[in-house]
């Protein structure tokens, strides 16, 4: 589970900013929103408010950047991701860290880099303990050799392999060492280096980021009758008018004609890469955009099977395509995986959860999410403008956060819990009145020409 994130000199975040999922021990409401791991109570939800251009989206982008950097390398566009409110920030270090739990172990992993040059200046991984102490598992400084903690005892075989990996990596200023220790390397269940695999796996497979520009995702739904029954049952609860969701098989040529060539080529390259990763390929993925919804299923080395969805509406004689649905209905399909997913220990990060949704539908979605995952290690962190859900009956005070820009155009993050409001306080009203900040401040404007 996510414990804490911190970021500095990234997008609109100039000075170090921090968001924590550790619960306050003074708040008694919604106790089921907490999960206890060892002696630490972690929150399952974080809702982030702020005016337009306050930096809310940049918080969501932090997770995308962090995951992309670990899994695929620091992206080329990172050269423009330093905080641009000060000239010196271009050559200043940026810092990124997440604290997480894997099983019942707590870790802090992070790195620093000069983004304008995509130059890694530091990297570290610590194991954290309940008494507040920490043990450095490995660290590196710039292009120097990564250093393993002296207290980690390796077998001769492991020691020789690790020294080889370090020798090969020494001098590298553009890559991270954590993914290097997971590139084609296998670990026995008794290995003292398992933390490399465990932390990397959590970042790669347990953070799910939902943004409009994330078209390729892995889903287990829309492929068989049982999952379709669940989807049909679920979609009816949202009063969209849809009475049935069906799948329809199409050819690769039809898929090619429905997509821009660049998008189709990129998708097929992704399929090819996935097939090459496995001796006997078997996977499913969904290709999704504002107007398209396609499922791709691969079994063995045969041609991928492609399906799309068709929709029936109440009292209608005709089927509808995905592109004929409203923005709100299409948005629901973006979020459906969050309700159906039964995997343990998943962090969902969603930018503008309420986009295109009616306020009551947003509230209903959150109620269902909380109800369906009440017993699971599953977290949801999302940004929103929807003040109607700023309600202590829905969220705890320590789950509500604000992002605000200061006079220097830099963003800061702070929690509602610092205001110590009464439990009967109408939070949404106080927020819109400006009590907590993080709302637009308008200047006057006169259409009349000056004389």
Residue ranges and their predicted role:
Residues 34-36, 41-47, 51, 60-118:
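Conserved P-loop NTP-binding catalytic core
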